[in-house]
């Protein structure tokens, strides 16, 4: 099981064409360039806030993905959406797209109706691409049911998050080995999960250009622009008149979290350095500017008391724009043990940051 949380490589090479949360460019997303015919299922959801209540401002689904009617778990105005796959499972070469935007001051809990199941994939790995954009003051708690990969299955999941420095992000995942006739715990071919989080501050327009009719003496009193190239274009004019850097140039990578499990390549998964006798693994990632030292110590206490084989670490490439990141990696003998730890962390953050009650999804 290979893990990489550093995300240091390519930190200065942001992807082009990525707009800030809430912009028309961002709403379309990078995946919009792909034809819908390429996806076995796709879901696009944009959540906005009005009068203290979050709601779906835009919603689109096609193929084997859709959402149930929204519901509100408490009086905070946070909306909960449940993703459904009517097909029941991911099969070989299936490709799924989720595109989620949580706009300014909106709050979303995103979950699934049941476990995500990946069966045999002889045609190639099943894939899921998820793109998330979080606006200023927004909140996303992504708490899906467990991921189960069965014998002969391969699964690749890529999650890309672009968040405002004032946004709050929580991503949870639990991986369970599927049943096999031989009784093997890890009979699938490969599992790869990659999560990347970038922080993009809002666009700040530059001061208005001076009146070109200003007296020459006044112009001479202005300090010289150290970045000005003689004979070159004015910076404000070259950036569309705003003087602000494009979103791609403002973005800073916070963290890349990777999990790769290839049972056959390692000759067994139960040894030291791999699953160490455990059957289930989980990861929880939190990104928020309010993750101070006192809260980190409290989260460490929750991890230590969980009864799982877990570790917690400060993750990321520094604190871009003041945003901090914490990652919890867990091993256990059951889904419920890891889920209980995740919920303990979720509930602690909900109460501290937003005064919300514990998360009770009311699925069953």
UniProtKB/Swiss-Prot annotation:
Keywords: Chaperone, Cytoplasm, Nickel insertion. Residues 1-37, 201-250 are annotated as: Disordered. Pfam families: UreD (PF01774). The keyword Protein biosynthesis does not apply. GO terms for cellular component: cytoplasm. It is found in: Cytoplasm. The keyword Zinc does not apply. It comes from the Bacteria. Residues 21-37, 209-218, 236-248 have a biased composition (Low complexity). One of its GO terms (molecular function) is nickel cation binding. InterPro entries: UreD. Belongs to the UreD family. UreD, UreF and UreG form a complex that acts as a GTP-hydrolysis-dependent molecular chaperone, activating the urease apoprotein by helping to assemble the nickel containing metallocenter of UreC. The UreE protein probably delivers the nickel. Required for maturation of urease via the functional incorporation of the urease nickel metallocenter. This is Urease accessory protein UreD.
